[in-house]
């Protein structure tokens, strides 16, 4: 779950 959140933020930034 955490990994998914990080990936989402990485896409935004």
From Swiss-Prot:
GO terms for cellular component: extracellular region. It is found in: Secreted. Expressed by the skin glands. It comes from the Eukaryota. GO terms for molecular function: toxin activity. Its main location: secreted. The keyword Secreted applies. Keywords: Antibiotic, Antimicrobial, Cytolysis, Hemolysis, Secreted, Toxin. One of its GO terms (biological process) is defense response to bacterium. Belongs to the grammistin family. Group 2 subfamily. Exists as aggregates of 3-4 molecules. Has lytic and hemolytic activities. Its hemolytic activity is inhibited by phospholipids, but not by cholesterol. Has antibacterial activity with a broad spectrum against various species of bacteria including both Gram-positive and Gram-negative groups. Has ichthyotoxic activity. This is Grammistin Pp 1. It comes from Pogonoperca punctata.
């Amino acid at each position: 779950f955490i990994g998914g959140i990080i990936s989402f933020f990485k896409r935004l930034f």
